[in-house]
Design a protein with these regions (language model features):
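Pyridoxal 5′-phosphate
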Residues: 1-393
């Protein structure tokens, strides 16, 4: 095995040397975070192992457990409360199926700052008879009095993004969970824009479920995510599907050497009472797990609190200077998350050519744009964006 590229996480920011040279100014980690040099090398080591052509001490089964342990440490969860899923949205769908909402009925309360890819989930549930209440944001923020009014004893699930992909709004999950739990409702949080970027503690929040993909602030690739289910919630759920990872104590009556007493009993088994025992069925993309083995160590050793603190001066100057240009910020003023969103009429037509020329990459939509700051950005990046926006007609 090759030596994984080492980088001292305690070194001063920006951590540009941790990554490959970036083309221009990259302010788009909210879409896809760059993979670090060490993460790429970890993936390459896994590929070499898959060649089975050299001596190695690679153990992907051990690595799988180690990565679950690292993610558990990152969010203050127990490892048995976690499993792998295919994506954030896959995890959200599994929770809905495990609650058997369509079969049992119920009410879902959500808001319009939830991930737009989840709109159709609740739209389709509504078509099938589930009452769905969607709270509208006001100036990029959520009024919890509206959640207080909407959540009742009829409510089964509250579904939100703990940090909104639209504008970086961060929910007060503890407050929301207190409101929901008072009525017996459970809370799901899409946390793909939260974990790894801003401190997150599942125990402190009281959240029942989270799902988090790995290609944004966890600094790996697509095709994998983590699902968290609070251990005391499991008895309220039904397994949405079945597979070998859910099984323990499997005894077969099929193969040579097995005891075959009768034709009816082909196998015996017990089911694991854990998040994996409810939701895991398949082999995951191990190459992404290999990346995570490096990137999660980097995040843990660097410290999410330190990452959060580093970007605050950049966020402040960007908000102040860009708003001074007449572009209204859509992100709540007290936000500490890495995302800033600004309204901009005809942004696709007016802004895209300007930023392309300046070599600046961020997310541009019809009438707004969003930037995302990470550990490799610095104040010069912020100032170059501001200078470019001053040329906007």
């Amino acid at each position: 095995m090759s030596n994984i590229i080492t980088f001292d996480p305690s070194s001063p920011f920006p951590h540009r040397d941790c990554f490959f040279p970036l083309k221009g100014i990259y302010l788009n980690a909210g879409v896809q975070h760059p993979v670090s040099r060490g993460s790429a090398e970890a993936a390459y080591d896994y590929i070499k192992y898959k060649g089975f052509h050299t001596d190695h001490d690679y153990n992907p089964i051990v690595m799988r457990k180690e990565v679950i342990g690292k993610f558990a440490k990152l969010i203050n969860a127990e490892p048995n409360e976690l499993t792998y899923v295919g994506s954030t949205t896959a995890g959200e769908n599994l929770i809905i199926q495990a609650l058997e909402l369509i079969k049992n009925g119920g009410q879902v309360v959500t808001d319009d700052l939830h991930y737009f890819g989840s709109y159709q989930i609740y739209g389709e549930l509504k078509k099938q008879g589930i009452e769905v209440i969607t709270i509208r944001h006001k100036n990029g923020n959520i009024d919890y009095a509206e959640y207080e009014a909407a959540i009742t004893d009829k409510t089964t699930l509250v579904a939100v993004s703990s940090v909104s992909t639209f504008n970086g709004h961060q929910h007060d999950l503890k407050r929301l969970c207190d409101i929901a739990h008072k009525h017996g409702a459970l809370v799901y949080a899409d946390s793909i824009h939260h974990i790894g970027a801003t401190p997150f503690d599942v125990k402190d929040s009281g959240v029942d479920f989270i799902s988090c993909g790995t290609f944004k602030w966890l600094m790996a690739d697509q095709g994998l995510g983590f699902l968290y289910v609070r251990s005391d919630v499991l008895p309220k759920l039904n397994r949405p599907w079945y597979g070998k990872r859910q099984v323990r104590n499997l005894v077969t009556h099929v193969f040579p050497g097995d005891q075959i007493a009768n034709d009816d009993q082909v196998y015996e088994y017990d089911l694991e009472e854990s998040t994996e025992g409810y939701f895991s069925v398949w082999s995951e993309p191990r190459i992404v797990i290999a990346q995570l083995n490096y990137s999660l160590s980097y995040i843990l050793e660097t410290g999410v609190e330190r990452i959060t603190e580093y970007r605050q001066p950049m966020l402040k100057i960007l908000r102040t200077e860009i708003e001074a240009l007449g572009l209204k910020c859509q992100t709540p003023p007290d936000s500490i998350t890495p995302l800033l969103t600004f309204a901009c009429n005809n942004a696709n037509k007016r802004l895209a050519p300007l930023l392309d020329k300046a070599g600046i990459k961020l997310s541009i939509y019809r009438d707004h744009f969003r930037l995302a700051l990470s550990v490799y950005n610095d104040m010069d990046d912020a100032k170059r964006l501001i200078d470019s926006l001053k040329q906007l007609d």
